[in-house]
């Protein structure tokens, strides 16, 4: 009988510990959904989604070209075909929340095409996106991307 209670206690402790470890901020799923929507919209060149739903009018960007820019500059790049990719993969490694701010970090692999720098090559980069929850919606207020490898 003592063995039964010992096993029951261990089993309950493992269940509780697993539940605590697997507990996730409910906002994380929404940020992951929006990150994927942003990635897909860039890949498709869907300016309506990017301009109206994802990118804040106040967004600033530290670009892979090592230039600090604004949302207007990013919009101009999109319109001119300078954000034109054959493929765009994003691997989120960490999402952290601080009140109404979400910080997303990870890696991206893109394959630029057309007249872009590195067209036809595989470009690996590190990224950080900063999201702000305001007026009942999330938008990107800052982005940083750094090229780490071109093949």
Annotate each language-model stretch with its function.
Residues 1-27:
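Bacterial Sec-dependent N-terminal signal peptides
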Residues 26-32, 46-98, 107, 119-122:
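A solvent-exposed, acidic/Ser-Thr-rich amphipathic alpha-helical stretch
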Residues 100-112, 125:
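A short hydrophobic beta-strand element
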Residues 111-115, 148-150:
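Sequence/structural signature of outer-membrane beta-barrel proteins
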Residues 124-151:
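Short beta-strand edge/turn micro-motifs at domain boundaries
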């Amino acid at each position: 009988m003592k063995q039964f209670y010992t096993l029951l206690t261990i089993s309950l402790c493992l269940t509780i510990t697993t539940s605590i470890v697997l507990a996730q901020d409910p906002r994380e799923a929404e940020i992951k959904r929006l990150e994927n929507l942003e990635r897909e919209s860039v890949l498709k060149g869907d300016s309506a989604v990017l301009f109206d739903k994802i990118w804040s009018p106040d967004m600033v960007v530290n670009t892979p070209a090592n230039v600090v820019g604004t949302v207007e500059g990013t919009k101009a790049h999109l319109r001119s075909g300078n954000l034109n990719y054959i493929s765009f993969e994003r691997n989120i490694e960490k999402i952290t929340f601080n009140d109404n701010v979400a910080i997303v970090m990870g890696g991206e692999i893109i394959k630029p095409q057309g007249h872009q720098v590195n067209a036809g090559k595989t470009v690996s980069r590190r990224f950080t996106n900063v999201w702000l929850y305001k007026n009942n919606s999330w938008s990107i207020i800052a982005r940083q991307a750094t090229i780490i490898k071109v093949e």
